Amino acid sequence: MLTTGMFLLEGSLLSPNPGLIFWTAVTFLLLLLLLKKLAWGPILSALEEREKSIQSAIDRANSAKDDAEKLLSKNKDAMNKAEVEADRIIKEGKEYAEKMRNEIVTKAQEEAKKIAAQAKAEIEQEKQQALNALRDEVATLAVKGAEKIIRMNLDAEKHKAVVEGMLEDLSTKRN
């Protein structure tokens, strides 16, 4: 206890002691020189190397970003061109389809007119044939009737009966 009390009486660690200050400064400077010679250079070179690698990574990232932006811009341009081309192709396809539809409709109408004209011509021809056949038959019947009338030289009642009979024959032949 006496030693602690003496230590307290002589001075505390907080009071300045010139010898202690000198040796602390010398030790600090020696340690500083030693660190500068042995550690400071490698630490600085490691920091510089690290800074260079970080800067290189940043430059590569910026370059990659620029390349990606250029590629994105090219892709957008290509997409826009593709959309324009697709729209043009669709428009041309629609125009071609409309043109083909119009041609088909026109051809179908012309064909229908031709078929109708042919049908009318055939109907007219068959009508004429039927009329000619009817005329021939009526003429034949009239001649036969006249022949019968002349041969019989009949009175009016018999004449009327012969004509009615011929008309009945004519109507049954028509059906």
Curated annotation (Swiss-Prot):
GO CC term, one of those recorded: proton-transporting ATP synthase complex
Species this protein is from: Chloroherpeton thalassium (strain ATCC 35110 / GB-78)
Function (record text): F(1)F(0) ATP synthase produces ATP from ADP in the presence of a proton or sodium gradient. F-type ATPases consist of two structural domains, F(1) containing the extramembraneous catalytic core and F(0) containing the membrane proton channel, linked together by a central stalk and a peripheral stalk. During catalysis, ATP synthesis in the catalytic domain of F(1) is coupled via a rotary mechanism of the central stalk subunits to proton translocation.
Family matches, as HAMAP family: ATP_synth_b_bprime
Entry keywords, A to Z: ATP synthesis, Cell inner membrane, Cell membrane, CF(0), Hydrogen ion transport, Ion transport, Membrane, Transmembrane, Transmembrane helix, Transport
Protein name, per record: ATP synthase subunit b
Family designation: Belongs to the ATPase B chain family.
Localisation per UniProt entry: Cell inner membrane
Membrane protein topology class: Single-pass membrane protein
Oligomer status and interactors: F-type ATPases have 2 components, F(1) - the catalytic core - and F(0) - the membrane proton channel. F(1) has five subunits: alpha(3), beta(3), gamma(1), delta(1), epsilon(1). F(0) has four main subunits: a(1), b(2) and c(10-14). The alpha and beta chains form an alternating ring which encloses part of the gamma chain. F(1) is attached to F(0) by a central stalk formed by the gamma and epsilon chains, while a peripheral stalk is formed by the delta and b chains.
Domain of life: Bacteria
CDD domains: ATP-synt_Fo_b
Pfam families recorded: ATP-synt_B
TM region(s), chain numbering: 13-33
A GO molecular function held by the record: proton-transporting ATP synthase activity, rotational mechanism
Primary localization: membrane
